[in-house]
Amino acid sequence: MKLLVLCVFAMMATLAVSRRYQFVQHQYIRKAFEVALKVEIIAGFDRTLVKWLRNHGRGLNENQRKVLYFVNRRYMQTHWQNYMLWIVKKTNALGRPPVVADYRALGAEIGRRIDMGYFYNFLKNRVMIPKYLPYMRRLNNMRPEDVPVANRNPGK
């Protein structure tokens, strides 16, 4: 039940962030750019989580902490295409072809700007942190660059 509510909350946040009720056209980027984005986004989210745990995580056990790391990765997966809308806008504004460093900077900005502390507080205060399950462990054990996202163009 808790996981269902978490998924519904993520879906509502997706709709709120996208500000539209239509399909978000998929944007595809090269693997090197994808890796740079994922590493920086997850690093930013994890830094936020470490700070949040230091201030608010006293009542959480080890498995609940691991679930919050899972929330970071799942949040990135859920919102990947919305990030791509913003990233395409930013890379087009450069006036030159983007390089990996540009994508690293954009990923770091996403990881820094999104207030994940709000979600951690929401889950903790409403006792909605789900049990730590095997699929969460599999995603947490992946390196950030290996976390799957919707970036594979089926036509290529």
Swiss-Prot record:
Signal sequence residues: 1-18
Keyword presence, Signal: yes
Keywords, sorted A to Z: Cytoplasmic vesicle, Fertilization, Signal
Record GO biological process: single fertilization
InterPro entries cross-referenced by the UniProt entry: Egg_lysin, Egg_lysin_sf
Subcellular location: Cytoplasmic vesicle, Secretory vesicle, Acrosome lumen
Tissues of expression: Sperm.
Source taxon at top rank: Eukaryota
GO CC entries: acrosomal lumen
Pfam families hit by this protein: Egg_lysin
UniProt function note: Creates a 3 um hole in the egg vitelline layer through which the sperm passes. Does not have enzyme activity. Species-specific interaction between the sperm protein lysin and the egg protein VERL exposes a basic surface on lysin that may dissociate the egg vitelline layer via electrostatic repulsion. Plays a role in ensuring species-specific fertilization.
Complexes and interactors: Monomer. Homodimer. Molecules associate into dimers and then rapidly dissociate again. Interacts (as a monomer) with the egg vitelline layer protein VERL (via VERL repeats); each VERL chain can bind multiple copies of lysin.
Protein name, per record: Egg-lysin
Source species of the chain: Haliotis cracherodii (Black abalone)
Taxonomic lineage: Eukaryota, Metazoa, Spiralia, Lophotrochozoa, Mollusca
